[in-house]
Amino acid sequence: MNTLFMHCRPGFEGEVCSEISDLAARLNVAGYAKAKAATACAEFVCTEEDGAERLMRGQRFAELIFPRQWARGIFIDLPETDRISVILAHMADFPLCGSLWLEMVDTNDGKELSNFCKKFEGHLRKALMAAGKLVEDAHKPRLLLTFKSGREVFMGLAESNNSAMWPMGIPRLKFPREAPSRSTLKLEEAWHHFIPRDQWDERLHGDMTGVDLGAAPGGWTWQLVNRGMLVTAIDNGPMAESLMDTGLVQHLMADGFTFKPKQPVDWMVCDIVEKPARNAAMLEEWIGDGHCREAVVNLKLPMKQRYAEVKRLLERIADGFKARGIRVEIGCKQLYHDREEVTCHLRRLDVKKPKSR
């Protein structure tokens, strides 16, 4: 099992290769990354048998930026019929697994395998359980089968607490009809990724206040309002009337880069289309100067050197806070609902909660 297989957004295979190569160098794992453009996946082939496992044990998956999912394992060829027997034969080299996910890459060809995987999963699950290779136990490794075609599959392992929350890293979120734009799903996904679900009632509740910079028409504002927050929406464009009718939104026509609240707020969110360095500087200012305790900000990516630019900005933010003696939690992820961008989350750890409204 010397191969680490990773899913990603189509077109970002190179960023995954750069990021995982950085990780391998940091952990002294020898090998090489490879990927084909627009295939929505990448591999890191280790020269040592335990290399892929060392990569996974040395890194929290949630802290990676561009991979959507990962697993360590092997590629196997499948016959046209009796695929299950071949998979069971290879399971001799795998431990007892606690769950099973069948996956496919996020391409048109991959999506065509969706129906096959749905039909095949039930039969495979029964066979694995009958063979004593699968039980229901979240503490045991997850068996991840990524089908490249009906004839080729990557058989992989990942720990359920150190891999994607959803198959292929694609969230199953339902678009709320009341929300004024589909961008609302981006903020909801960010919360799922950056905030443990059992902390939502503590960190996203109705006694809080928030600011949405570049708010119109209100996709992100809707998420804050849906949690019961009192929101100041900053945008020169119009907000959805349905949001204004809630009585929880104050709309100010102002520049999102110059506006500052008179009193600290709990949350600042921003999806303004601007150069990533400018949005990163604004994020650092809001958290560093105490204008908010938590923030979610999108960084639009350049055409080239995208991983290098994100890494540079994150290091600049971290170094800035360290120099000022400010304790923060920094996260960054290319979410499923992101396009040519990444989503950053910052949480200040050394300030008291603002007074309730």
Regions from the language model: what does each represent?
Residues 1-357:
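SAM-dependent transferase fold signal centered on methyltransferase-like domains
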